[in-house]
Amino acid sequence: MAQVHPTAVVHPDARLHETVEVGPYSIIGPQVTIGAGSRVGPHVVIEGRTTLGERNRIFQFASVGADPQDLKYAGEDTELVLGDDNQIREFVSLHKGTAGGGGATRVGSGNLFMANCHVAHDCVVGNGCRIGNGSALAGHVTMEDHVIISGLAAVHQFTRLGKHAFISGGAMVTMDIPPYATAQGDRAELVGLNTVGLERSGFSKEQIERVKEAHRILFRSKLTLQEAMVRLRAELAGHSEVDHLIQFIQQSKRGLTR
């Protein structure tokens, strides 16, 4: 049986693995599922149709699975789904999805949500991401894997952040950030490549050089984006890291930060 502090309120219909720990004064609703090895600290609220995988840790005063801050929301049965090994720090808020956004907010595994950050309805967060203190994702934002957002940054709704991108502190992001890039400012602009992040993620020197050349063609060559894409396909297509960059740009709807 899960270890539940006597002051916590866990609905009898909630499904908690026997190794789950729930701290003082926390509240867990009837549609909540929490996987093995997860730890819920004091004064946490987990509600709605929320599913947490294994070994997640939720710190005090976090709000997980609350209704979306969307005036169109009318009580539809939507959900929040998290994978494994996530850390949700103090005063973080993660909201469930809306019917108009696919019905779910989805979070992968191995992510760190630092204190006071917010993930809005219908966001998709990949694996190995970091969101800094006080930063916020508006609704329908997509973060690919291994994206880092520093503190006090904000991301506009429907924006996409490419994998291994780095968003500097205080940035206001209103357009898609391409994979591997570093962006900063209000409104955010590209200032270089996240080389340190790529090295830490195990990219080879050859892969990093190809990414550098791809970014040079796209963002430093004075070509139009269409012209740069033609050149990029001709010179560097066929390598997975470049092919992903090409695909990301092709799928952009908000436009690309350059």
Curated annotation (Swiss-Prot):
Lipid biosynthesis as a keyword? yes
Q: Where in the cell is it found?
A: Cytoplasm
Name its pathway.
Answer: Glycolipid biosynthesis; lipid IV(A) biosynthesis; lipid IV(A) from (3R)-3-hydroxytetradecanoyl-[acyl-carrier-protein] and UDP-N-acetyl-alpha-D-glucosamine: step 1/6
* Domain of life, source organism: Bacteria
Q: Where is the signal peptide?
A: none
GO molecular function: any one?
Answer: acyl-[acyl-carrier-protein]-UDP-N-acetylglucosamine O-acyltransferase activity
Where does this chain mainly localize? cytoplasm
Name the chemical reaction catalysed here.
Answer: a (3R)-hydroxyacyl-[ACP] + UDP-N-acetyl-alpha-D-glucosamine = a UDP-3-O-[(3R)-3-hydroxyacyl]-N-acetyl-alpha-D-glucosamine + holo-[ACP]
- Kindly give the InterPro entries that the UniProt entry links to this protein: Acetyltransf_C, Acetyltransf_C_sf, Hexapep, Lipid_A_LpxA, Trimer_LpxA-like_sf
Task: Describe the task this protein carries out.
Answer: Involved in the biosynthesis of lipid A, a phosphorylated glycolipid that anchors the lipopolysaccharide to the outer membrane of the cell.
- Name the family: Belongs to the transferase hexapeptide repeat family. LpxA subfamily.
The record's section on PANTHER family has: ACYL-[ACYL-CARRIER-PROTEIN]--UDP-N-ACETYLGLUCOSAMINE O-ACYLTRANSFERASE, ACYL-[ACYL-CARRIER-PROTEIN]--UDP-N-ACETYLGLUCOSAMINE O-ACYLTRANSFERASE, MITOCHONDRIAL-RELATED
State what protein this is by name. Acyl-[acyl-carrier-protein]--UDP-N-acetylglucosamine O-acyltransferase
Please spell out the taxonomic lineage of the organism that makes this protein: Bacteria, Pseudomonadati, Myxococcota, Myxococcia, Myxococcales
Gene symbol of the encoding locus: lpxA
